[in-house]
Amino acid sequence: MKENFDIFFRRKPALMLVSLKKNTRMRYGSILAKEVDCTYSHAVKILQTLEELKLVEFERKGRIKLIRLTKKGRAVADAIDNIQGLIR
């Protein structure tokens, strides 16, 4: 299944969106990086791109930046999740 999924998507960004969708709480970048098995610095670069695409937004709570999906991001995550289910 992993190989089929990788044919269609860049694995880490897609997994980040799906992970944010499945867990409705706002998330920290470091936790998200661990969930998708990448370094924190790589996760930050991906998240910056997702923010530019208006798929995620950040909320600062003191020193911590929390991440959540936008409406558009949720729609994209739903589509990725559906496709992932179809190619299993």
Show where each model-derived region lies.
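Short alpha-helical segments that sit at the start of domains
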Residues: M1-M16
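Amphipathic alpha-helical dimerization/coiled-coil segments
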Residues: M1-E3, R74-R88
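Pre-recognition alpha-helix immediately N-terminal to the DNA-recognition helix
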Residues: A14-S19, A75
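Beta-hairpin "wing" of winged helix-turn-helix
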Residues: L53-G62, R68
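Short, locally clustered residues in the helix-turn-helix/winged-helix DNA-binding domain
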Residues: V18-T24, D81
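Short acidic, hydrophobic short linear motifs in intrinsically disordered regions
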Residues: R25-K34
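Helix-turn-helix/winged-helix DNA-binding modules
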Residues: F8, N23-T24, K61
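Short amphipathic alpha-helical interaction segments
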Residues: D37-E52
